[in-house]
């Protein structure tokens, strides 16, 4: 068995195992990723993120869910990648460009005490609303905003958004009382979502103040989802429920999401290193 060095980090409770692959090209099988992510027999995480060198950006974020499947992007994950590369001396830039499966994203690091990163703002790019590009199998290419979705005995309405990965946003009266763990997996694997989908269940808490629970594709319910929060703000604005500068509370913490005049979405939130170690794989 080989020994693998890792760092565990979290962004408002969305926790991943980070592996620095800038010096050695480390690759793991889906089974190894499942083992590492297991909260009883492994380190325990929502997945594994490799930090790699990039020919297109300054660094590359290579992300995998806890079930071993690959994913294009994670908003909380990219903030942790940005913190790692700065705090561990891999870059001195406060605006590094990070390559992801959703494209190259630029981050803005807010430095706190001890010359460590406290907050990270990420330009998440423009939301995608064209059904075939999300993707959603739909009757036409018009945007899907508050459209009916029947799941079991629930008659829901959903808005479909891609932030580099697919999201289905559903507004409900009380997210905490809603059966997320029962309904979430049914929507995730619904036939209209050919690549499966992340599902957000959202409650309005006040003007430009929303509360979100997330069922993540390949990971189940998580404490937070950054790309999901971006999709929630977009859906809230498009349905007239919120403005373009919104506080979104998640079970793990709070994010600020802004829809800028350029059309791009800006996400700002914390990132924290929990511990480092080695594991036999």
Swiss-Prot record:
GO biological process, one term: lysine biosynthetic process via diaminopimelate
Primary location group: cytoplasm
Pathway terms, separated by semicolons: Amino-acid biosynthesis; L-lysine biosynthesis via DAP pathway; DL-2,6-diaminopimelate from LL-2,6-diaminopimelate: step 1/1
GO cellular component terms given for this protein: cytosol
Cellular location(s): Cytoplasm
Domain of life: Bacteria
Family: Belongs to the diaminopimelate epimerase family.
Name this polypeptide is given: Diaminopimelate epimerase
The species this protein was found in: Leptospira interrogans serogroup Icterohaemorrhagiae serovar copenhageni (strain Fiocruz L1-130)
């Amino acid at each position: 068995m080989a020994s693998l060095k890792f760092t565990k980090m979290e962004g408002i409770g969305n926790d991943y195992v980070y592996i620095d692959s800038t010096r050695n090209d480390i690759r793991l099988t889906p089974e190894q990723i499942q083992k590492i992510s297991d909260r009883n027999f492994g380190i325990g995480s929502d997945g594994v993120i490799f930090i790699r060198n990039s020919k297109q950006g300054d660094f590359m974020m290579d992300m995998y869910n806890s079930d071993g499947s690959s994913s294009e992007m994670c908003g909380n994950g990219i903030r942790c990648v940005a913190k790692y590369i700065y705090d561990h001396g891999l870059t001195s830039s406060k605006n590094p460009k990070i390559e992801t499966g959703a494209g190259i994203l630029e981050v803005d690091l807010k430095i706190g005490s001890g010359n460590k990163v406290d907050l990270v703002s990420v330009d998440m790019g423009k939301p995608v609303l064209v059904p075939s590009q999300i993707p959603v199998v739909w009757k036409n290419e018009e945007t899907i905003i508050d459209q009916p979705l029947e799941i079991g005995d629930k008659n829901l309405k959903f808005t479909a958004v891609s932030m580099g990965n697919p999201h289905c946003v559903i507004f409900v009266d009380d997210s905490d009382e809603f059966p997320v763990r029962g309904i979430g997996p049914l929507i995730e694997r619904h036939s209209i979502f050919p690549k499966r989908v992340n599902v957000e269940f959202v409650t309005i808490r006040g003007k430009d103040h929303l509360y979100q629970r997330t069922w993540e594709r390949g990971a189940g319910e998580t404490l937070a989802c950054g790309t999901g929060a971006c999709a929630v703000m977009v859906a809230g604005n498009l349905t007239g429920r919120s403005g373009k500068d919104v506080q979104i509370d998640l079970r793990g913490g709070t994010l600020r999401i802004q829809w800028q005049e350029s059309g791009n979405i800006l996400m700002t939130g914390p990132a924290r290193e929990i511990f480092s170690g080695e594991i036999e794989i």
